[in-house]
């Protein structure tokens, strides 16, 4: 019997995909789930996949690989999509696809499948990664083929086959969780005019209910990578887990946004990224201290393009690798310590130090002029403003003024 390897999350979409693939393709279905830091969600997957009709399931622990090879490069790049989204789902999809291909090769499968909808970004991310890594594999996307047209239809389909799913008609939210973030979409969130219900947040305390006393965290970076939290050297997974807890308790990391999907429509999502938000802002503060003006400003352009590549599923492309090479050069001096103050949803800097600081206090203060002669500014302004002056004079001469 021919085999298909399904990217399995245990959620609604992939739960109903198992019997559907068997009924419509006659495949032996092998499930593959990536442990990206979902935590307790993984516990019931093995039994659930088998009960749903899978012949076996692989649960791959890729947490450290996720952090070191996907999260940290994106963090160093300073990538954030449309000013708010820290790319938690986008970064995870190419890694899941990579593991999907590895299991397919191991099992001799002729196809892979995923549970992404035909309206979303994830279908693109999964399939571009598979095409880049294994162009010979057939890709099946049930949502683009079956008669199920809504999450409610999928719940009915699962119920008819005795498949337990975590989504009910009363709470039909689509969730995606990993070490970096938790996303919420669907139901009443689809109307951007609605405030998210108070029970939506699962990782972060609502800011108004957060402690009345601020919390401080000290993060040490080496070449753009966080290595210590409050003076303690930690492995990357533990560092993010601890920071998630501290930031979440203080209401930090909520992003409620309407974003432009790759497939051409806008969508509304609520993202919880507690630790990631702190790391992103802390890293930015350290760059402001250690990078020169030209490098910093050009890196902002790179960050925007990097975010688009990751969001669009273009992880395994030469351009992303080339941008990584540029970013790595910029991070040579991004070493130091940043203290961040967390208070009722706010995350602000409370001190930054680096042995590579480009800030010269004596030069920057309004004191004596031994180092910086203020009279020199006049000549600089005359030369810097010369194009403006010449243009104005020529326009006046031509009667345009």
From Swiss-Prot:
GO terms for molecular function: argininosuccinate synthase activity; ATP binding. Pathway: Amino-acid biosynthesis; L-arginine biosynthesis; L-arginine from L-ornithine and carbamoyl phosphate: step 2/3. One of its GO terms (biological process) is argininosuccinate metabolic process. Its EC number is 6.3.4.5. It catalyses: L-citrulline + L-aspartate + ATP = 2-(N(omega)-L-arginino)succinate + AMP + diphosphate + H(+). It is found in: Cytoplasm. L-citrulline binds at residues 85, 90, 121, 125, 174, 183, 259, 271. HAMAP family: Arg_succ_synth_type1 (MF_00005). Homotetramer. This is Argininosuccinate synthase. It comes from Pelotomaculum thermopropionicum (strain DSM 13744 / JCM 10971 / SI). The lineage of its organism: Bacteria, Bacillati, Bacillota, Clostridia, Eubacteriales. The gene is argG.
């Amino acid at each position: 019997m021919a085999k298909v390897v399904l990217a399995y999350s245990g959620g609604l979409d992939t739960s109903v995909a198992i019997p559907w693939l068997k009924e419509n393709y006659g495949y032996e279905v092998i499930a593959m789930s990536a442990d990206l830091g979902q935590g307790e969600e993984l516990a019931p997957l093995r039994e659930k996949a088998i009960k749903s009709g899978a012949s076996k399931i692989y649960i791959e622990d890729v947490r450290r690989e996720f952090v070191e090879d996907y999260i940290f490069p994106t963090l160093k790049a300073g990538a954030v999509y449309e000013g708010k989204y820290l790319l938690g789902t986008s970064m995870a999809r190419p890694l899941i696809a990579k593991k999907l291909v590895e299991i397919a090769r191991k099992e001799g499968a002729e196809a892979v499948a995923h549970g992404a909808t035909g309206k979303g970004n994830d279908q693109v991310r999964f399939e571009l990664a598979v095409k880049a890594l294994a162009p010979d594999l057939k890709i099946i996307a049930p949502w683009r083929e079956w008669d199920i047209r809504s999450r409610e239809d999928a719940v009915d389909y699962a119920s008819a086959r005795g498949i337990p799913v975590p989504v009910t008609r009363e709470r039909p939210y689509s969730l995606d969780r990993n070490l970096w973030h938790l996303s919420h979409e669907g139901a009443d969130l689809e109307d951007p005019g609605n405030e998210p219900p108070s029970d939506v947040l699962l990782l972060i305390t609502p800011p108004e209910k957060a402690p009345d006393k601020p919390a401080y965290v000290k993060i040490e970076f080496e070449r753009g990578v966080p290595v210590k939290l409050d003076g303690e050297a930690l492995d990357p997974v533990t560092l993010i887990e601890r920071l998630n807890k501290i930031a979440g308790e203080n209401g930090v990391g909520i992003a409620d946004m309407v974003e432009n999907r790759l497939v051409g429509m806008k969508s509304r999502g609520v993202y919880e990224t507690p630790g990631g938000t702190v790391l992103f802002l802390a890293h930015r503060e350290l760059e402001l201290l250690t990078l020169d003006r030209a490098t910093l400003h050009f890196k902002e352009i790179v960050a925007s393009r990097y975010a688009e590549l990751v969001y669009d599923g273009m992880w395994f492309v030469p351009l992303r690798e080339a941008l990584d090479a540029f970013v790595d050069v910029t991070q040579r001096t991004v070493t130091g310590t940043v203290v961040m103050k967390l208070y009722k949803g706010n995350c602000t800097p409370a001190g930054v130090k680096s042995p590579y600081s480009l800030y010269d206090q004596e030069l920057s203060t309004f004191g004596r002029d031994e180092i910086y002669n203020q009279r020199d500014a006049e000549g600089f302004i005359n030369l810097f403003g010369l194009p403006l002056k010449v243009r104005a004079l020529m326009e006046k001469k031509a009667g345009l003024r």
